[in-house]
Swiss-Prot record:
It comes from Rotavirus A (strain RVA/Human/United Kingdom/ST3/1975/G4P2A[6]) (RV-A). InterPro entries: Capsid_hemagglutn, Rotavirus_A/C_VP6, Virus_capsid_a-hlx_vir. Belongs to the rotavirus VP6 family. Residues 62-73 are annotated as: Interaction with the inner capsid protein VP2. GO terms for cellular component: viral envelope; viral intermediate capsid. GO terms for molecular function: host cell surface receptor binding; metal ion binding; structural molecule activity. The VP6 trimer contains a zinc ion located at the center of the molecule. The zinc ion is not essential for either trimerization or transcription activity of the DLP. Zinc-depleted VP6 has an increased sensitivity to proteases. HAMAP family: Rota_VP6, Rota_VP6_A. Ca(2+) binds at residues 266, 286. One of its GO terms (biological process) is fusion of virus membrane with host plasma membrane. Homotrimer. Interacts with the inner capsid protein VP2. Interacts with the outer capsid glycoprotein VP7. Interacts with the outer capsid protein VP5*. Zn(2+) binds at residue 153. Pfam families: Rota_Capsid_VP6. This is Intermediate capsid protein VP6.
Length: 397
């Protein structure tokens, strides 16, 4: 994997900097590194593809070295270099696609394709290593079964979940109380509602709670907490739990009271915030517990009083909500991230070449299913294919 990254980094630099008119002295170190790559690769044969519709391709390396010049690089020099660069880039692209198409239930973090396994051989250790990539650093650690640490912005840590629970339900669904939520990606939105606006609740207060367990622990997370859940702020028709009927939800938004968010790790509270909104920090957690209250306003103008009558029918439904959004966090496991294209790159290659469903990844690389059942085997394979995708993205956009 380190060789693949070093090849890609060298090729990217060569493509960007070996251009007509450039002073040789400005790129002499790069050209020496480029020539070392050619010397190491010459005389070797590789084969890629042969899975799904990914065609089998054979690769032979027999290229001349780039020479020295006293002045600027001329058109002939650059054209010779370009021919070599384009062949190497095509090779790297196919090695990456071959690797992204494969999976293994055992030691899935190790190279799976024939070409990448060959590149891991001792003879290729002479290629100048560049391990500056976060994915390469963490792949090396994971390969040695040591602690990794990926920095994610908008981590796709929450499997998609959208549902509701009813704490009070009447047969005609005209006097309900409960919670509804939408968890997806890096965001939780939860709303507590009471058609009667806590009319008969103790002290006219309804208590709500929403608990979310993460599939992997996060550390040093920067989080935004808001006293609102905009996705539940407009009327809607909702299917009943048994599917036998539907019920109408017509929210009137109130501000939540006594808001508390707890971040827990292995059942122990690590951080707690009360009535604090905006940016908050969570040190280490695998569970989030949100609790909040709906309080019937003790004093109401006639207009507000008309919204929340003392008896049925309740045409407007008191609602309070919270939004919790993870802006950035560190995770020991690789995840999809809204700010990265790695999952999209891997999925696109597997779809384009009709890669058959294997023993590890779900059909279509369904992220919700993958993260819901995030096994060690999936973690290993995902770390490998995301590392390869990050390498490929240097050369192929």
């Amino acid at each position: 994997m380190e060789v693949l990254y070093s090849l890609s980094k060298t090729l990217k630099d060569a493509r960007d900097k070996i251009v007509e008119g450039t002073l040789y002295s400005n790129v002499s170190d790069l050209i020496q590194q480029f020539n070392q790559m050619i010397v190491t690769m010459n005389g070797n044969d590789f084969q890629t593809g042969g899975i799904g519709n990914l065609p089998i391709r054979n690769w032979t390396f027999d290229f001349g070295l780039l020479g020295t010049t006293l002045l600027n690089l001329d058109a002939n020099y650059v054209e010779t270099a370009r021919t070599t660069i384009e062949y190497f880039i095509d090779f790297i692209d196919n090695v990456c696609m071959d690797e992204m198409a494969r999976e293994s239930q055992r030691n899935g973090v190790a190279p799976q394709s024939e070409a990448l396994r060959k590149l891991a051989g001792i003879k290729f250790k002479r290629i100048n290593f560049n391990n500056s990539s976060e994915y390469i650093e963490n792949w090396n650690l994971q390969n040695r079964r040591q602690r990794t640490g990926f920095v994610f912005h908008k981590p796709n840590i929450f499997p998609y979940s959208a549902s509701f629970t009813l704490n009070r339900s009447q047969p005609m669904h005209d006097n309900l109380m409960g919670t509804m939520w939408l968890n997806a990606g890096s965001e939780i939105q939860v709303a507590g509602f009471d058609y009667s606006c806590a009319l008969n609740a103790p002290a006219n207060i309804q208590q709500f709670e929403h608990i979310v367990q993460l599939r992997r622990a996060l550390t040093t997370a920067t989080i935004t907490l808001l006293p609102d859940a905009e996705r539940f702020s407009f009327p809607r028709v909702i299917n009943s739990a048994d599917g036998a009927t539907t019920w109408f939800f017509n929210p009137i938004i109130l501000r939540p009271n006594n808001v508390e968010v707890e971040f827990l790790l292995n059942g122990q509270i690590i951080n707690t915030y009360q009535a604090r909104f905006g940016t908050i920090i969570a040190r280490n957690f695998d569970t989030i517990r949100l609790s909040f209250q709906l309080m019937r306003p003790p004093n109401m103008t006639p207009a507000v009083n008309a919204l929340f009558p003392q008896a049925q029918p309740f045409q407007h439904h008191a609602t309070v909500g919270l939004t919790l959004r993870i802006e950035s966090a560190v995770c020991e496991s690789v995840l999809a991230d809204a700010n990265e294209t790695l999952l999209a790159n891997v999925t696109a290659v597997r779809q384009e070449y009709a890669i058959p469903v294997g023993p590890v990844f779900p059909p279509g690389m369904n992220w919700t299913e993958l993260i819901t059942n995030y096994s060690p085997s999936r973690e290993d394979n995902l770390q490998r294919v995301f590392t390869v995708a990050s390498i490929r993205s240097m050369l192929i956009k």
